[in-house]
């Protein structure tokens, strides 16, 4: 996770949440906005660990394929969606990072 955020130059990063998220082949995540809460304070990073050319992500009016092994910051407060038109499931490793996480947010949820 630290390698994925190196360019942010955090002094004291905290990683309160990490998960694997699967989007099955042929499935869609409809356009939505994640709730505010701590999302206003965190950077949400997606790293595709299994993907295919038909796995697409839409945010800010832009549709793109997120390449295997690359790290992408996603603004999940803005409207976003995803679709997987490929034959293989898409799996992303997703984690949150704060600079000096607020008290009570230092636990890791996996």
Give residue ranges: language-model regions:
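Signature of the catalytic double-stranded beta-helix
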Residues: 1-20
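Conserved short histidine dyad/triad with adjacent acidic residue
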Residues: 20-38
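Short, conserved beta-strand element in jelly-roll/cupin
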Residues: 22, 39-54
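A short secondary-structure junction signal
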Residues: 29-34, 56-61, 105-106
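Short beta-strand His + acidic residue motifs that chelate non-heme Fe in jelly-roll/DSBH
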Residues: 31-32, 55-57, 74-75, 79-87
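A short hydrophobic beta-strand segment most commonly corresponding to one strand
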Residues: 42-48, 71-73, 87-105
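A short beta-strand-loop-beta hairpin characteristic of the jelly-roll/cupin
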Residues: 48-68
């Amino acid at each position: 996770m630290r390698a994925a955020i190196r360019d942010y130059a955090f002094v004291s990063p905290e990683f309160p949440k990490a998960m694997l998220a699967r989007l099955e082949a042929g499935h869609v995540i409809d356009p939505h906005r994640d709730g505010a809460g701590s999302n206003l304070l965190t950077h949400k990073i997606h790293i595709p660990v299994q993907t295919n050319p038909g796995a697409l992500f839409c945010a800010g009016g832009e549709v793109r394929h997120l390449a295997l092994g690359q790290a992408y910051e996603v603004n999940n407060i803005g409207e976003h969606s995803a679709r997987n038109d490929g034959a293989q499931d898409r799996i992303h490793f997703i984690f949150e990072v704060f600079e000096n996480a607020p008290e009570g947010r230092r636990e890791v949820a996996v």
